[in-house]
Amino acid sequence: MAAEKTLQEYGVLCIQEYRKSSKVESSARNSFMGLKDHLGHDLGHLYMESTDPQMSAAVPWPMVEKPTMDTVNSGKEGKGVSEENVSSGDSEGSTSSDHESEQLSSLSVEPCSLTKTHRQLCRSPCLEPRLLKHSDILQDFKPEESQTPSKEVKKPPDVVREYQTKLEFALKLGYSEEQVQLVLNKLGTDALINDILGELVKLGNKSEADQTVSTINSVMRETSSLESQRSESPMQEVVVDDGENLRPVVIDGSNVAMSHGNKEVFSCRGIKLAVDWFLERGHKDITVFVPAWRKEQSRPDALITDQEILRKLEKEKILVFTPSRRVQGRRVVCYDDRFIVKLAFESDGIIVSNDNYRDLANEKPEWKKFIDERLLMYSFVNDKFMPPDDPLGRHGPSLDNFLRKKPIVPEHKKQPCPYGKKCTYGHKCKYYHPERGSQPQRSVADELRAMSRNTAAKTTNEGGLVKSNSVPCSTKADSTSDVKRGAPKRQSDPSIRTHVYQDIEEKLPTKNKLETRSVPSLVSIPATSTAKPQSTTPLSNGLPSGVHFPPQDQRPQGQYPPMMMATKNHGTPMPYEQYPKCDSPVDVGYYSMLNAYSNLSISGPRSPERRFSLDTDYRVNSVASDCSSEGSMSCGSSDSYVGYNDRSYVSSPDPQLEESLKCQHMHPHSRLNSQPFLQNFHDPLTRVQSYSHEEPKFHPKRPLPHLAMHLQHPAVGARSSCPGDYPSPPSSAHSKAPHLGRSLVATRIDSISDSRLYDSSPSRQRKPYSRQEGLGSWGRPSYGLEAYGYRQTYSLPDNSTPPCYESITFQSLPEQQEPTWRIPYCGMPHDPPRYQDNREKIFINLCNIFPPDLVRLVMKRNPHMTDAQQLAAAILVEKSQLGY
């Protein structure tokens, strides 16, 4: 009975659903929404009742179909009010069904509590017809309602996406959107990407005249026309403004008329032709100057034709008559050329004439420049006025730009490439390609050549600066007289030097020649050099810094002849006849002092503090100034000084020559003299102790004080003193031969000759010194400088360092040394006020180039240097060391 009631209930429910389905046909959407609600409730009850997995399959149907119906419902926003009314009406009909379903659930629960089989039996026949009904209803609605809106809403986005993906793919490959549209129109929107790509490749390979790419050609033509319009737009703007952009024109009427009349007749028609030519070009400011006397009637000596043209142009305010009048029957004419040039210059215009106006060009330089740049010459070909297309020459502006105030950018004058866009030369093509735009028209090779030229120019400029930094720092004494007479610089030709020295010696008295040769010169030291020991003999004391010699010239002295040892840098030794013999007993043993120091190697790092001036840095330990033909020491030369009595002069074949050479040297017995001799050197004391047989007592690490350079004997052309400090003699007095060739340094001629140094020193009176005075002067802390008239302008080193001469003993001099001595001197310049003025001027000039502190520092270290170039070189060296 219960089963029958259940079936009846289900039958009633199906009938009600069928009736509702008929309502859906009239208003499909509204009734379907009500049915959906009813089915949702009904299936919800069934889901609660059943645990069978087969029944759970009914659950996804409303869950899947509900979003679809919701989308359909969301698309109908305008019918919201009517939907609410219909749904409210349907809810009344659905209340009964809901009530019946509740009863059904209550009825179905009871049998389920009794037997499970009955629940399955009553559930299976009642659910299947309902599911069939639901599927039929959905099939009725899908083709009518849900499918048509889905096509309308969903398909267009898919088409757009496909089109966008295909378009992006083609654009990435370099094709244009127009080409993609052509291919899609040909193949359809559903074409595969491979087909589209193949068609695009075919389309790209086809010629421009193909019909399939006609639209592309039109687009290309449009773009090219736009570009041409853009390129021509400034031209058009200039043409529009050409009347304002054109320069004023001033015509020399007399010159034009006579040129048209073949220099025989004043043809006014020529003026008319010239004016018309400029008017046709758009010129508005045209002025023609003609002398007023041309208004007179024609005469045999002054033929004039077409005078009415002058009247007409005057009425048009184009022609202007320059004043002229008659005074006592004579014509007084103003210079019309001056009117022409003046007006053209003031109005910044153009002069039309075949005259050069040389007389006016010489009056004012601005007129000369204006005439050179603004003169337009012309020619008449029958009755045609023809100015040149290049008024200022082949490389000048064109005629159009010449007549404009602001010239137009010149068009490319290169020949267009015959291959056009098919040219495969690229940037190497020498022809003009308009599609390149602003790219350089020169080939790559030309660009590289231009870059290499610029780089070479830069390196050349930088090279000059580098050379200036490497200029050796040298201390040289130049007087104002040397600056005035332009002393010769360092020369490599010995013959030139010989003539110079001969001229100087002719002017100097014989009494002073030896003294001139005894004046020591200074040696330039390179700013940066690597100091290497040049002798294997170890020094007992620390080598002073400041002397550097590169190793390239480290050759034994024996390779050179005795009289050519120091002149090998110049090629030719000086003749012996130039050097007169000296009879001074002092000089006999002078170069014997060299033997004492022949084993020393001059090396050590350079220190800027060790560079001293001419008066303060008198080196005695490198007294290698020779009266022979040695050249002065070159910068960085490491040729060694040689004890002449040991090696060079022993091999002299001529005894008289040897005697004359020995007169410039000291006695060979004084091989080594004391360390104080190196430190505290004085002329008479040198003579005394140069004959001493005492071995020196060394003070190894004692710093060398400033030395007075009163006794150094460079020969004519010899330079002996090095600007650095010099080492002490070695402890052994007999180590001479093995190191003679490498010990001391040969010198080369410097930029200042000995005679010049002599001229720069004051002509003082030489004072004789006796042996006792010489011995007594050792104890004087003032060094005996006052005896020479030398006033000390700077402080000597600290006296805290005890002198080294206290332990020195002196032997008696030979009898031949008893006569008084003439002591050479190189001291202060001749005129101290002028000397200071020059120094001040040099200081001011150098301060304009270098930092004042640096200039002051270098000038303090070189107190007697008056050569601005040498000071600048020293400043550059100091600047590089201090890291300015």
UniProtKB/Swiss-Prot annotation:
GO terms for molecular function: endonuclease activity; zinc ion binding. CDD domains: PIN_Zc3h12-like. Keywords: Endonuclease, Hydrolase, Magnesium, Metal-binding, Nuclease, Phosphoprotein, Zinc, Zinc-finger. Disulfide bonds: none annotated. Its EC number is 3.1.-.-. Residues 500-516 have a biased composition (Basic and acidic residues). It comes from the Eukaryota. Pfam families: Regnase_1_C, RNase_Zc3h12a, UBA_6. A zinc finger (C3H1-type) spans 411-436. Residues 87-96 have a biased composition (Low complexity). Its cofactor is Mg(2+). The modification Phosphoserine is found at residue 231. Residues 66-108, 456-548, 716-739, 755-776 are annotated as: Disordered. Induction: By bacterial lipopolysaccharides (LPS) in macrophage cell line RAW 264.7. Residues 456-478, 518-543 have a biased composition (Polar residues). It is an enzyme of class 3 (hydrolase). PROSITE patterns: ZF_C3H1. Residues 246-401 form the RNase NYN domain. May function as RNase and regulate the levels of target RNA species. Belongs to the ZC3H12 family. This is Probable ribonuclease ZC3H12C. The gene is Zc3h12c.
